[in-house]
Amino acid sequence: MTIIQKIKQKEKLMNRRNFLKFNALTLASMGVAYANPMHDMHSMHKNHSINHDLDTSFINFAPKNLKLLDPKQFPQGEILKALPLLKNESKEKNIFRATLEIKENHIELIKGKKTLFYTYNGLVPAPKIEVFEGDKLEILVKNKLKEATTIHWHGVPVPPDQDGSPHDPILAGEERIYRFEIPQDSAGTYWYHPHPHYTASKQVFMGLAGAFVIKAKKDALSHLKEKDLMISDLRLDENAQIPNNNLNDWLNGREGEFVLINGQFKPKIKLATNERIRIYNATAARYLNLRIQGAKFILVGTDGGLIEKAIYKEELFLSPASRVEVLIDAPKDGNFKLESAYYDRDKMMVKEESNTLFLANINLKKEKLELPKNLKIFKPLEEPKEFKEIIMSEDHMQMHGMMGKSESELKIALASMFLINGKSYDLKRIDLSSKLGVVEDWIVINKSHMDHPFHIHGTQFELISSKLNGKVQKAEFRAFRDTINVRPNEELRLRMKQDFKGLRMYHCHILEHEDLGMMGNLEVKE
């Protein structure tokens, strides 16, 4: 009997009152059934479908003898600049109308050398979109690239046909208008990036990523000044050009050698302890474990906006695509260093030293601040009526003898390696279905040897519990998210519902893994 069947059987045996108390601790009592997925993983790997379009032409490799840019050539230590704002072309109340032109642009980051980027409106970093709950958006997107693209409004609850999925490409030379209304109670820190079939990772590392902030007319912290820290990374060769991925990038996700904040390398940041800071992990695969020696973070928000109460943190863990809202607490004025401590995510075929990464110098001014006891009233979802199981895995048979394979064999192996429920992604296949407005619990299980951040389109979820090495833990605090890390052999219980009918994606947000097939299609029906 599978975990899903056991849960449903348990629900039938329990009366309504007791079922409302049914939680992750009950799941733990199921023992082996909860610890083991519903399919035998060996047979899944043996029989997984590789009949999808195995077009491996998108898998390109950088030269093996590639020489990278000397870090000393990259300007550093400059005062951090604010993100540019996307101009609202409308003068109508509650209407945000704008244009995003996606095009190549040569930008001089390195003195005397211009780097070819993909850009939104010619800018790196991209312009920040700032809107309010209830606003209606009309964004004209002109694709001036030589390839198809989309814009995915990551985490923003929009209808499926406006979500920039790989099913709705904007072909080279074409344009379209994205139209959607920002729902009430959706204030939070989001971002936008491409989501075309096979090439999301390339288009992001070429420069396409921007901040997207939804504000409430009034919330517990709306009186505070704000700053954005959009963290990305960049790889440049000795000619200051952005090279293709190497094999390790395809296996583990690309981590550029230059970690940037708002497009700047090791900047100086002026902050005050009464500033609301939005931090974005806009990298393809880099995990961030942020800390400020001599100071603490005050966590006030996650992907989906403010949390119930402020939480003091020595470190902030952000998997790729995650965002947080914080303030900084320090005993006095001073100069501090923003760093990212090493996080071992069990990469394939790579040995790393556990080095701490220096990101920026912070000049911090101590200001008076009284945080309210409660930041937001959390409105939990109802108890679940349906359950789903997601198994993220890797086909180790494809990895066998990899270093001895030809380039064409490597490409085929890569395109068949990263799986969800034993399958590699097929654009035309429906993998799961959900009912509109019905609350579901998803059990997301990582049966691979490395970390994978799980992301779902169209909604946000609440983490209910996690299980690792037989130990079940309830979530540390209540919050809505759209992206969450899943460690090797870990099981997460996520509660969610979909409020729009149509097709959605769920996938690993290491973008190379997404492109290589660690993704599925969810059909939402009435």
Residue ranges and their predicted role:
Residues 141, 279, 338-340, 507:
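Extracellular beta-strand-rich recognition modules
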